[in-house]
Amino acid sequence: MPRKHLIANQTNKKQQTSAKQLQKLAKRIASAVKKGGTNIQSNPHLKVAVDLALAKGLSMDSIKRNIHGSEKDTTKISEFCYEIFGPNGVGIIVFGLTDNPNRLLSSLNGYLAKLKGQLAKPNSVKINFQEEGIIFVNKNNYLKDDLIELLILDNINLIDVDYDEECFEISLHSNSYFHAKELLKKNNFSIVDSEIKLVPLLTVDLDRNQQTLLSRFLNACEEDDDIQFVVHNANPWEE
C-alpha cells in the first residue's frame, strides 16, 4: 500500500516543534528512565525515546538534562494505551503518559463523545497494526535499487522503499531500525526524519463529515498534555 503520507505528515509537523511537543518528549524520556534507568544503550525504552527526541530537533545536551532530572523526580508516571473504534469503524490507538489517570480517562471520554466513538476491547484494534521503522533520507545520488542492495546485503529486514524527487522513504521491521540508521549514516546519507511507529495493515475511507470528526478528535488529543500520540487507519484526506 502507498506509504508516502505516513512520513510526509511527520515531516510537515517537524518543521516547527511546538513547546507542547517538547514537553511530551520530556515526559516520554522521564517515563523511560523510571522504567529502566539512565543508560541509553541498555534501556530500550529510553533508546527509542531519545531517538525520537533527536529526530524532532532536541539537542543531546537538553536530552541529557532531562534524563538526569528524571532520575531525581519521584512523580509516578503511568502508561496507558486505549483502543477505539470511530466513525465507519476506523481504528484508533491512543497512547498516554500521565500522573493522573482519572484526568486522562475523563478527558478521553469527552473527546470520544464528540467523535461518536467507543472504547474497544484490548487488541481488537492493535491487531490491524504492525510496528515498523520509518526512515526518511535524502537521495544522495543513489538509485532505488542501489539503496535496496545496500540494506539487504547488511541483513536489514526491509519492507519497502518509496521515493519522491528528493528523498527515499524506507520502511523496515523495527528490529532493524537502529542498525539501518547506523548503516545509512556510514554511507553518508542525510536522515531527514525517522521513527518507530505503528502502521495500519488495512485502511478505511471516511466521508467529509467523518473526516471532520476525526480531525477534531486528533487536534484535541494533540493539545492534551497526558496524551503522547495517536495512530489510526483512516486513509489520508486534504484538509
UniProtKB/Swiss-Prot annotation:
InterPro entries: Integrase-like_N, TACO1_YebC-like_2nd/3rd_dom, TACO1_YebC_N, Transcrip_reg_TACO1-like, Transcrip_reg_TACO1-like_dom3, YebC-like. GO terms for cellular component: cytosol. GO terms for biological process: regulation of DNA-templated transcription. It is found in: Cytoplasm. GO terms for molecular function: DNA binding. It comes from the Bacteria. The keyword Disulfide bond does not apply. Its main location: cytoplasm. It holds the Pfam family Transcrip_reg. Coiled coil: none annotated. Keywords: Cytoplasm, DNA-binding, Transcription, Transcription regulation. The keyword Protein biosynthesis does not apply. Belongs to the TACO1 family. PANTHER family: TRANSCRIPTIONAL REGULATORY PROTEIN YEBC-RELATED (PTHR12532:SF6), TRANSLATIONAL ACTIVATOR OF CYTOCHROME C OXIDASE 1 (PTHR12532). This is Probable transcriptional regulatory protein MG332.
